[in-house]
Regions:
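A beta-strand edge to alpha-helix "cap/lid" segment located at domain peripheries
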Residues: 1-24, 34-121
Length: 121
């Protein structure tokens, strides 16, 4: 696995957002994943909670673009952190910091930790 392949995992996630299907997005997360989302104060601890978050988030029609990416790989764990910008169907854009922690499960890379927080004003 190399940095380009880890960066491409964001493209996979962003493509899942474009489907508008929260189940497809949640499927990219490990069963025991933790999501600290951008536009919710509730920490999500499992697929049901993660899927619930994306039901509401996807209704806004988000499209993400990475502005800065920093990838580190530690065997079967990879981390991608940086800054991304989401543009919503109403034209509003939000820039946020992100961290994705991925774990190789023998079949593919799954998100085990995802933290996203809006940039401070």
């Amino acid at each position: 696995m190399n940095k380009c392949e880890i960066t491409a995992l964001f493209d996979q996630w962003n493509s899942a957002l474009k489907t508008g299907d929260p189940k497809q997005v949640a499927a990219l997360y490990a069963a025991d994943a933790i999501l600290l989302p951008t536009v919710s104060n509730q920490v999500r601890h499992n697929h049901a909670e993660i899927e619930d978050y994306f039901v509401h988030f996807l209704a806004k029609g988000p499209q993400g673009v990475i502005n800065e990416s920093n990838v580190r790989i530690f065997g079967d764990i990879a981390i991608n952190s940086g800054v991304y910008t989401f543009t919503f169907k109403d034209g509003v854009s939000v820039q946020a910091r992100f961290t994705y922690v991925y774990r190789w499960d023998g079949l593919g890379w799954l998100i085990t930790e995802h933290h996203s927080s809006a940039m401070p004003e």
